[in-house]
A protein has these predicted regions:
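Catalytic nucleophile-elbow at a beta strand-turn-alpha helix junction centered on a G-D-S/GDSL motif
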Residues: 1-9, 28-31
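Alpha-helical cap/lid subdomain in secreted, periplasmic
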Residues: 12-21, 30-162
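Acidic/charged coordination and interface sites in well-structured regions
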Residues: 25
């Protein structure tokens, strides 16, 4: 619990500090091939791939893992970002799906993708908003991604959707 509190403090500090505000790139769609829409002349602290219910319904954990590994390899190895996170909103509540995602996060700590992960949360108005016909992530969603980067162990062992 202490590590989670420290992660909260650090995430708030990063998001509210004007001097060291992290840069984010967020693109929705687990199925869409958006990889080349990342501006290749910029570097990002974190790239978040947001996935909604329609795409999660037809994805398996293995497909998410493959996609995350592909993106991590291309984006991390070529220096475009430091972290790649797949953020699943509106998750399927099956225990086996959650267990396999947790296991993948645990295993990814021991290979080159340790700074990547798959996160799942219940949808809430605090995480997304609609603007110009598109769904965007809020500051709270970025804060959760930062907490994962700062203290990933909190999201590997106890599954908590809040």
């Amino acid at each position: 619990m202490v590590r989670l509190r420290e992660a909260n403090i650090q995430a708030n500090y990063f998001l509210e500090s004007k001097d060291i505000l992290p840069s984010f790139f967020c693109q929705g769609g687990a199925k869409s091939d958006w990889l080349w829409s990342v501006r290749l002349d910029q570097q990002y602290d974190c790239i978040i791939i947001a996935i909604g219910s329609n795409e999660l319904a037809c994805c398996t954990v293995e497909q998410l893992q493959d996609r995350l590994n592909d993106y991590s390899y291309h984006l991390l190895c070529h220096g475009f970002t430091k972290h790649v996170i797949i953020m699943g909103l509106w998750p399927r509540k099956s225990e086996i799906f959650s267990l396999r995602a947790r296991l993948f996060n645990k295993l990814s700590r021991h290979n080159m993708y340790w700074h990547s992960g798959i996160l799942f949360w219940d949808w809430s108005r605090k995480l997304t908003y609609k603007f110009d016909g598109a769904v965007h992530l809020t500051k709270n969603a970025y804060r959760r991604a930062l907490k994962f980067i700062i203290s990933p162990v909190q999201y590997i062992f106890p599954y908590n959707s809040k």
